[in-house]
Amino acid sequence: KHGVLTPEDPYAKWPGPGPTRAIVPTFLLFDYSFRPAGVSRADAVAWAEASGIRSADEDLLAPDPFATRDDWCAARIEATEARLSALPADVKLIVANHFPLRADLAITPRIPRFSIWCGTTKTNDWHRRFNVEAVIYGHLHLRSSKEIDGVRFEEVSLGYPKQWRQSKPLADYLRPIL
């Protein structure tokens, strides 16, 4: 109706040249697993708060109808894994998610303990398990382009308006993915 793909919609086929590609919007959330090995799940939020960090999601992101955000994240992972597993093996995937799919990409130098609100370790290997060509995300507001195991990981957020150089044209903030 509005021309927007959601994670529940059939995956769109990329109309450009080359191999068959599917545009895969996902909605995977976070489960506090992007934390150091010595920090338990039960202590994760307190660990982050000890450095003066607390995500607004703790107060504003209700997990309903799930009991916790962890449960909601697990349900989204399970549903998405099932859909990805059902795709033909020769279809290349362009995955778009709000959060990075790997813990090593959830690095915020000024607020390192914010990582617990940046994704889930359950997706760390998805770029190898599935036929992923590129992963697009934006939660960190730290634009970057990395290649891991031959897969591009593109942090493409525009950031907040205060982070923009108003003299720079919008086109300078954009980059081709395919």
Predicted features along the sequence, with ranges:
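A structural motif corresponding to the C-terminal end of an alpha-helix
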Residues: 2-5, 80-92, 125-133
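Beta-strand-turn-beta hairpins that frame and shape the catalytic cleft
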Residues: 4-7, 11-25, 30, 91-92, ...
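Low-complexity, flexible helical/coil segments
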Residues: 5-15, 57-63, 129-135, 169-175
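Catalytic metal-binding/acid-base residues of hydrolase active sites
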Residues: 11-12, 28-29, 100, 133, ...
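Active-site-proximal loop/helix segment associated with metal-binding centers of metalloenzymes
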Residues: 22-94, 101-110
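Divalent metal-coordination and catalytic microenvironments
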Residues: 23, 98, 139, 153
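Binuclear metal-dependent phosphoesterase catalytic core
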Residues: 107-108, 113-116, 120-133, 140-178
